[in-house]
From Swiss-Prot:
Family label: Belongs to the DNA mismatch repair MutL/HexB family.
GO CC annotations on file: mismatch repair complex
Pfam families: DNA_mis_repair (PF01119), HATPase_c_3 (PF13589), MutL_C (PF08676)
Organism: Anoxybacillus flavithermus (strain DSM 21510 / WK1)
HAMAP family named in the record: DNA_mis_repair (MF_00149)
GO biological process, one term: mismatch repair
Protein name (Swiss-Prot/TrEMBL): DNA mismatch repair protein MutL
Lineage: Bacteria, Bacillati, Bacillota, Bacilli, Bacillales
Superkingdom of origin organism: Bacteria
Length: 608
């Protein structure tokens, strides 16, 4: 007797459910995506016990015809594709015909639906088996209730996390779908309490404010790019707004939320040297492309996709984000504790530059007196959580209030930071400077690190024949495997100024180096660059030069607790203003922080 047998439908559906229905959030995702495909404009999701007890999804979409209701719970039954060619031009979120039978097989499911052209249809299924059916109201749309989830698969139920964790996954799903479809009104309630709401007016900025809070939304800037193959729209947060994980990076492709590691890397490369190590940005990208360029039929959950022009897309994303920051002032603002009302009038304020005398010739600064009249008004402060959505209705927000404020991201015609006039130094580490806009605090090490980094980056990209012989040639010995690896990348190292000659068994000798190598650090730099090659295994010239420039700039920059003369401070600030990115060091730490005059006056209660 043969050993191979065909599985019955109930068991096959449970196996399929293991891939499609991982947790309550998976059920919500599949049902809401079906509602979106049905052209719904209002979608409401109700949960009890994070969906483990009950999930209800109500929409005003097209609804089901009566005969379609029964067929919808058969495996691989779908209205969204008809033949093999349709797989290459998928424009809907669902297409596999697995969601409803998979969900029904591991739960109790009740369906009420109508096309609005007569009485609707009512079905009840338990474990995928039809137990009741009849008529219901003619309200157009669909109402699906899923209860007793995983009642017949206790092993899956055993691995569910806490209510709080499972609820967080559901909120995450709704957040991303709301961003992908801002023209749809979403409402999410849990145990009778509203957690999230959007009005469906099509304004992505209001959805961002509902998810991340008004403060974060104000610090996100719009981006746009278009080529023959791709159109990119979205919002990216300023580099000062970061998170510890990539969970806050949302990428939508043709209306579908996806996860793609190479796209994440491209986004972060767009923030090159603007992010601190180990931190990630908050971003929302909406990418449109021809369906022929994307394969979504990779996994039943449809989160993983493949692109046929992945390199071109990554380069466009990287370039678009990088260009969005090139004309922006990225100086973090320090804000005082918020107050609900401010005085209608304010005294005029003047400032003067205080220049310390030094033993050396210091540039003289003309004292400037400028009167500023501040016109303030009553402000209504909407407190929004950065991580979770409160109960406030975001539709109450003025659309313009979500646009990044000009003082945070103002565009500069000539210079990315204004002229700064030094006041002095604090603890031999921070430079204090001022201008008519307030007080600036500059990290002197980070500032010079940025200056040196851009200098060394340019030098490393230029081939030079101006070499300086080493007084005592440097001999380097490695293991056999390391020697072979270094030998294979000698040309790349030479392009960066490290000239290696084989010298005996598993050894190299270095006789000279470029003249621009920092004096006294030549040997350390050569050894460090070879170490980077050994760590990288596969050497990329751009990455090698980048790491070398960062390493050199860090070693050569002034350190903390190093006191500077006035002329040195002036020179440092002027050099910083001439850099291409004067806001962060190569490691992504901020260089300069701004206290506006208004914020200082709030701190000292001069403005109440």
């Amino acid at each position: 007797m043969g050993k191979i047998r065909k599985l019955d439908d109930a068991l096959a559906n449970k196996i399929a459910a293991g891939e499609v229905v991982e947790r309550p959030a998976s059920v919500v995702k599949e049902l809401v995506e079906n509602a979106i495909d049905a052209h719904s404009t209002i979608i409401e999701v109700e949960l009890e016990e994070a969906g483990l007890a009950k999930i209800r999804v109500v929409d005003n979409g097209d609804g089901f015809e009566e005969e379609d209701c029964f067929l919808a719970f058969e495996r691989h039954a779908t209205s969204k594709i008809k033949d093999e060619a349709d797989l290459f031009r998928i424009r809907t979120l669902g297409f596999r015909g697995e969601a409803l039978p998979s969900i029904a097989s591991v739960s109790h499911l009740e369906l009420k639906t109508s096309t609005g052209e007569g009485p609707g249809t009512w079905l009840v299924l338990k474990g995928g088996e039809l137990v009741q059916h009849g008529r219901t109201s003619s309200r157009k749309g669909t109402d699906i209730t899923v209860s007793h989830l995983f009642f017949n698969t206790p092993a899956r139920l055993k691995y569910m996390k806490t209510i709080h964790t499972e609820l967080g996954h559901v909120v995450d799903v709704i957040n991303r779908l709301a961003l992908a479809h801002p023209h749809i009104s979403f409402r999410l309630t849990h145990n009778g309490k509203q957690l999230f709401y959007t009005n469906g007016n099509g304004d992505v900025r209001q959805v961002l404010a509902a998810i991340y809070g008004l403060d974060v939304a104000k610090k996100m800037i719009a981006i746009h790019a278009e080529t023959l193959d791709f159109t990119i729209d979205g919002y990216v947060a300023l580099p000062e707004v970061t998170r510890a994980s990539r969970n806050y990076m949302t990428t939508i492709v043709n209306g579908r939320y996806i996860k793609n590691y190479s796209l994440y890397k491209a986004i972060e490369e767009g923030y090159h040297t603007l992010l601190p190590i180990g931190r990630h940005p908050i971003t929302f990208l909406n990418i449109m492309m021809d369906p022929l360029l994307i394969d979504v039929n990779v996994h039943p959950a449809k989160l993983e996709v493949r692109f046929s022009k992945e390199t071109e897309l990554n380069e466009l994303v990287q370039q678009t984000i990088r260009q969005s920051f090139q004309k922006k002032t990225l100086i973090p603002e320090v804000t005082a504790p918020r107050v609900e009302k401010t005085k209608a009038e304010q005294q005029t304020f003047s400032f003067e530059h205080i220049v310390k005398e030094s033993n050396t010739m210091s540039p003289r600064v003309t004292e400037i007196h400028r009167d500023q009249e501040k016109k303030t008004e009553e402000r209504i402060v909407l407190e929004k959580s950065d991580e979770h959505v409160r109960d406030q209705d975001v539709t109450l927000l003025d659309v313009e209030s979500v646009v990044p404020s000009e003082h945070v991201t103002g565009e500069m015609d000539q210079e990315r930071i204004p002229p700064l006039y030094p006041i002095g130094q604090m603890h031999g580490t921070y430079i204090l400077a001022q201008n008519e806009n307030g007080l600036y605090i500059i990290d002197q090490h980070a500032a010079q690190e940025r200056i040196k980094y851009e200098y060394f980056r340019e030098k490393l990209a230029t081939v030079t024949n101006e070499l300086q012989p080493l007084l005592i040639p440097l001999t380097l010995t490695y293991s056999s495997s390391e020697y072979l690896l270094i030998e294979s990348y000698r040309d790349q190292l030479a392009a960066c100024g490290v000239f290696l000659e084989p010298f005996g068994h598993n050894s190299f000798i270095v006789r000279s180096h470029p003249q621009w190598f920092p004096k006294g650090e030549e040997v350390a730099i050569i050894e460090e660059m070879i170490k980077q090659v050994l760590e990288m295994k596969k050497v990329d010239m751009k990455q090698l030069r980048e790491k070398a420039a960062i390493m050199m700039s860090c070693k050569q920059s002034i350190k903390a607790n190093q006191f500077l003369r006035n002329d040195e401070i002036f020179a440092l600030l002027e050099s910083l203003r001439k850099t291409s990115d004067p806001f962060t060091c190569p490691h992504g730490r901020p260089i300069i922080i701004h206290f506006s005059t208004y914020e200082l006056e709030k701190m000292f209660k001069r403005v109440m």
